[in-house]
């Protein structure tokens, strides 16, 4: 039974600048009878700038109550930034958008992420042997493009190139597509 409670606030400072803040509070997440993720509140604050109708830059600072593995020097604070150009609209076939993002987020600030880098076990797929135990966080970039194929049908392609923010022995590249 996984529950996450949160509060997200957004404020348009003016026509170009906007601010956001959020607070997230999870209940402990269990993997069978074992606690897979402890309760750890996360706070975020971000600032965005709209250059024009098509281009937006947004950066966010994230901080957790405590690091996941403090005894190993894992961090509890990080940041992320994203630059968006245009953007596909579900009600506008033929519309498209692209973005680039950079993340430096310790495991303590991530509850779930598309890249699936923040895992507690990683395996060598050739031998199915465990390589690393411990949470990794994410540090690296993501690029993506989306295109509206038909009304309410959007295709997306994302590429991730990450290493662990807390454990840089973990590296991953991944392509992700959606329709």
Tell me what each language-model feature is.
Residues 1-12, 24:
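Contiguous mid-protein beta-loop-alpha structural module that forms a pocket-lining wall or clamp
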Residues 12, 16-18, 23-179:
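Outer-membrane beta-barrel pore domains
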């Amino acid at each position: 039974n996984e529950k996450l409670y949160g509060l997200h606030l957004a404020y348009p400072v003016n026509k170009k600048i906007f601010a956001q803040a959020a607070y997230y509070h999870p209940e402990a997440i269990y993997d069978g009878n074992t606690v897979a993720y402890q309760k750890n509140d996360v706070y975020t604050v971000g600032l965005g700038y709209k250059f024009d109708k098509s281009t937006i830059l947004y950066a966010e600072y994230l901080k957790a109550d405590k690091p996941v593995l403090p005894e190993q020097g894992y961090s509890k604070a990080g940041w992320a930034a994203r630059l968006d150009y245009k953007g596909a609209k579900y009600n506008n076939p033929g519309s498209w958008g692209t973005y680039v993002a950079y993340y430096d987020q310790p495991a303590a600030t991530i509850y779930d992420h598309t890249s699936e880098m923040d895992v507690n076990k990683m395996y060598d797929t050739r031998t199915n042997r465990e390589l690393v135990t411990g949470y990794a966080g994410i540090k690296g970039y993501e690029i993506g493009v989306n295109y509206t194929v038909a009304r309410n049908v959007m295709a997306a392609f994302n590429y991730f190139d990450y290493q662990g923010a807390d454990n840089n022995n973990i590296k991953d590249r991944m392509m992700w597509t959606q329709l």
